[in-house]
């Protein structure tokens, strides 16, 4: 209850801008950073917590930083950060140590009957999904953005076997991704195949469904 009520954020910020960029920490982010830096003043930036360090090193200040990790591993993404202007939007599933650590935050209740029973309507409700890119996208939708660009959302390993972008706090080959069953799927635009794992593939399917369900609200 110490966080900024989500409904207040909506009342103050909804439909103020049309263009949003959702930034994730996939391997392709590295090559997209120069363009993002050049256009950072042309759009509102939603940053997955894992990509925060990469943006900070380029002098890019995101408007929103999202997190929904139920473990405290994400503490590393926020430690020793100079940025105090971004609004940290956290899921109700976010680990309590991170909730207490961060200032300028809004803890948002998931769009679920279980949470609606608490009658804390000022702090809800949003479809947070199962990963931060989903959360960032639905947050941008809730704020009324009409054009939402997704970058760094590979959901696949690159040709060198990297799971994350250069500069990721846990390394480009994050060990947490190595022991999950792998499979090959068609690459973006159907150009060949890429290696992914079952969790990422599930994220991809859910994201594609999310985009399709909201194609009248926002262009992807």
Q: Model segments located where?
A:
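Metal-ion/cofactor- or nucleotide/acyl-coenzyme-handling active-site neighborhoods
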Residues: 1-46, 53-220
């Amino acid at each position: 209850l110490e966080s900024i009520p989500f409904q207040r954020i909506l009342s103050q910020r909804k439909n103020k801008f049309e263009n949003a960029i959702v930034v994730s920490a996939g391997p392709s982010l590295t090559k997209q950073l120069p363009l993002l830096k050049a256009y950072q003043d042309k759009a509102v930036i939603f940053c997955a917590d894992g990509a925060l360090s990469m943006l900070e090193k380029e002098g890019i200040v995101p408007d929103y930083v999202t997190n929904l990790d139920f473990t405290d591993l994400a503490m590393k993404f926020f430690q020793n950060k100079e940025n105090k202007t971004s609004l940290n939007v956290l899921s109700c599933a976010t680990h309590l140590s991170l909730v207490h650590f961060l200032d300028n935050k809004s803890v948002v209740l998931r769009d679920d009957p279980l949470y609606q029973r608490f009658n804390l309507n000022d702090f809800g409700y949003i479809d947070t999904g199962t990963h931060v890119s989903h959360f960032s996208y639905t947050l941008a939708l809730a704020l009324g953005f009409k054009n939402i660009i997704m970058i760094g959302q590979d959901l696949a390993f690159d040709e060198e076997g990297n799971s994350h972008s250069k500069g990721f706090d846990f390394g480009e080959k994050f060990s947490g991704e190595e022991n999950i069953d792998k499979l090959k799927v068609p690459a973006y635009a159907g150009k060949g195949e890429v290696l992914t794992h079952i969790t990422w593939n599930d994220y991809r399917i859910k994201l594609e469904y999310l985009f399709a369900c909201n194609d009248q609200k926002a262009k992807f």
